[in-house]
Regions:
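Conserved micro-motifs of the catalytic ATP-binding
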Residues: 6-9, 46-49, 122
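Detector for a conserved hydrophobic position within an alpha-helical segment of the HATPase_c
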Residues: 138-139
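Short conserved segment of the HATPase_c
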Residues: 105-118
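A conserved beta-strand-to-alpha-helix junction within the catalytic ATP-binding
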Residues: 10-24
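Conserved glycine-rich
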Residues: 143-144
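Short alpha-helical Gxxx[C/S/T] motif in the catalytic ATP-binding
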Residues: 130, 134
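ATP-lid-like helix-loop hinge signature
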Residues: 66-91
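Conserved catalytic submotifs in the C-terminal HATPase_c
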Residues: 35-45
């Protein structure tokens, strides 16, 4: 499977802000009606990582947000669609938060932990590999991901620990 064949990351200095911006441009093509504000507090955040794999993480997460928003739009066509992204660098870690106002994690009720397991899916045609691959990439980059229920949508937090790298 794709999952077993994940290549080892090739770690090089990359600008996380640039990687996220590139992926925002990419997904903006999918739906021009979704606002994607990106809040940064520095010009660059250099991080030792695999550019391709990190791109895959952000692309996957933002695409999930878009699908969630589209699901909500079927029932409520007139809401203002938004995915907000924020990146903050502290001394020993980098935090990235992605918040969307889609259908949220309610469908998961108690299964929010299962979301990272291979082949677990709530989508009609989902493979259940997306988030497990995201999780593997983040683990390989000394990162972790958390899924947080919020009132009107979903919140995903990624933390890269800079101490052990």
């Amino acid at each position: 499977s794709d999952f077993a064949r994940m290549p080892k990351p090739i770690l090089k200095d990359n600008d996380l802000i640039q990687i996220i911006n590139d992926n925002i441009k990419l997904v903006s093509e999918l739906d021009r009606n979704i606002r994607i504000p990106f809040k940064t507090y520095s010009k660059k955040i250099i991080f030792k990582g695999d550019k391709e794999q990190l791109s895959r993480v952000f692309l996957n997460l933002v695409k999930n947000s878009i699908e969630s928003i589209k699901q909500k739009e079927e029932k409520n066509p007139n809401f203002s669609k938004e995915i907000s992204i924020e990146i903050i660098e502290n001394n020993d870690h980098i935090n990235i938060t992605i918040i969307d106002n889609g259908v949220g994690f309610d469908i998961l009720s108690n299964n929010i932990k299962d979301i990272l397991h291979p082949y677990f899916t709530t989508k009609k045609y989902g493979t259940g590999l997306g988030l497990s691959i995201v999780n593997k990439i983040l683990n390989d980059h000394n990162g972790k991901i958390e899924f947080i229920k919020i009132n009107d949508g979903a919140k995903v937090e990624i933390t890269f620990n800079l101490n052990d790298s």
